[in-house]
Amino acid sequence: MPAAIHPISASGQLCFHESGMFRQDSLIMLKFIIKRICASIPTMLVLITVSFFLMRLAPGSPFTGERNLPPAVMANIEAKYHLNDPMYLQYFHYLKQLAQGDLGPSFKYKDFSVNELLAQSLPVSAELGFYAFLIAAIFGMFIGIIAALKQNSWLDYSLMSGAMTGIVVPSFVMAPVLVLVFAVRLQWLPAGGWNDGGLMNLILPVVTLSIGYVSSIARITRGAMIEVLNSPFIRTARAKGLPMSRIILRHALRPAMLPIVSFLGPAFVGIITGSIVIENVFGIPGVGQLFVNGALNRDYGMILGLTILVGIMTILFNAILDILYAIIDPKIRY
């Protein structure tokens, strides 16, 4: 007669097996994260290199608008900013600055570096972008789920028609319309300004910046959720009598998140670039105003620093999204 297996021994073996599987999954995930971070480094270097040489080779100079500058003064200015060095030396000098966290000088605001100007304006743009991104993700997913649950109903058609309108109308058209309605006619909200990020000053720019991405995320969520709700495992859950709220939250939401996560990277880039227009429309003292002033004054120190900063932020954000994608869908790790 075979010997009986002690229940404690069997339980211990099961725990050991599960612990080993957990360590293996953790190791695979760690390797994936390291691989993704390492893959971002060459992309950053290419971004820095291309941005630097495009700015340096562009026609004009930040000092060509200055009047009656003697050659000796111009030579001193160029020597101060290393502009009379060979191009490759300027490039390596800039890389050395970046390695120390220095984005270089501003040629327009001569008493300030790019870092000092960003320290004042970046928190404003970050607050605006954060709220717009948060609203886009939450409301977009909520509208998409409601539309999927009410598929082919009048509510579905109404929500998707509104979403299509939000997608096709650009923010620089939407902004004056919202100002005209809510600030001029109804006088519910201020037409512009920042006022230290007060709630009333935030509403119009945040809504204007986020409305297109709310619409896009809503349409993506609706399509993904409809596909998941028609899956066999969802039909099985319904047959068991599980409430719809539990089916959505515990079974359908995670697989439906995959295309949404894929879209968040382009949405992040769009919100950053869109904030340039929104900040100038509403008079918000953020990075957008620095970018426009730098472009108008040929301050390529400022433009280069902002381009590299936004590019690096985008690369890092996409790397984070890839890691999040791998957490949601473990097959990506292998």
How does the language model describe each region?
Residues 24-26, 84-141:
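An internal, D/E-rich "acidic patch" concept
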Residues 44-92, 108, 112, 186-204:
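Hydrophobic alpha-helical transmembrane segments of membrane transport/permease proteins
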